[in-house]
């Protein structure tokens, strides 16, 4: 295995890449200098904290701490997903249920099949990958669902007036929203290895692992990303479409205003 380590000095020199981005922003008057500095500073602090937390959890190797960390990851993913729901109020609970269930089922299958072991060194990184992907998919699902409901209010009202239930009136919108949310994950699976070398595969190869073995892990990652994204978006969409209707099965127009 490759024993090369990144020193603090080399990391400081790599910071020059950020300076390049800042210079481009300044030259082109993009006004992103503060955002770049803030995002980089925040990323450094967050990663340092997470690094020490993970080091402690890995050394303790406690099942309850591992589960707690997985729930914390799902909590943060749900919190960020609901912030992207521009047209849906109070979507955190739905997001948390969707992402936690999707990630939980996927992790359970991976552990029971022997693909990974229930140890923090394997469970936590995998949970981070699938929860992050589910977060993006659920956010896209919310946005698409809200936009479609707003643009098709008249058609929905007509269906309701003809006796359709909210589920029947929203069926096409739900299907299209789930489909739109899954397209990035599906497209990524189509081009994996051809357009880009994904994170896990690149990391393993960089660490000196045999590329063929790294590919097996990446195939597993592709499977789990598709599974979690599908489960999470379906659950999220079916939990949130009801928010556009009241107890009398009427479309709540006031709730459709963009926040």
Swiss-Prot record:
Protein's membrane topology: Multi-pass membrane protein
One annotated GO biological process: iron ion transport
Gene designation: fetB
Origin superkingdom: Bacteria
Function recorded in the entry: Part of the ABC transporter complex FetAB, which is probably involved in iron export and enhances resistance to H(2)O(2)-mediated oxidative stress. Probably responsible for the translocation of the substrate across the membrane.
GO cellular component: plasma membrane
Organism ancestry: Bacteria, Pseudomonadati, Pseudomonadota, Gammaproteobacteria, Enterobacterales
Subunit comment: The complex is composed of two ATP-binding proteins (FetA) and two transmembrane proteins (FetB).
Family: Belongs to the UPF0014 family.
Location(s), subcellular: Cell inner membrane
Effect of deleting the gene: Mutant exhibits increased sensitivity to H(2)O(2) stress.
Periplasmic side: 1-5, 113-117, 213-218
Disulfide bonds: none
Residue intervals on the Cytoplasmic side: 27-35, 78-91, 139-191, 240-259
InterPro entries recorded: FetB, UPF0014_fam
TM annotation in the entry: 6-26, 36-56, 57-77, 92-112, 118-138, 192-212, 219-239
Pfam family for this entry, one: UPF0014
Protein name: Probable iron export permease protein FetB
Keywords annotated in UniProt: Cell inner membrane, Cell membrane, Ion transport, Iron, Iron transport, Membrane, Transmembrane, Transmembrane helix, Transport
Major localization class: membrane
Organism annotation: Escherichia coli (strain K12)
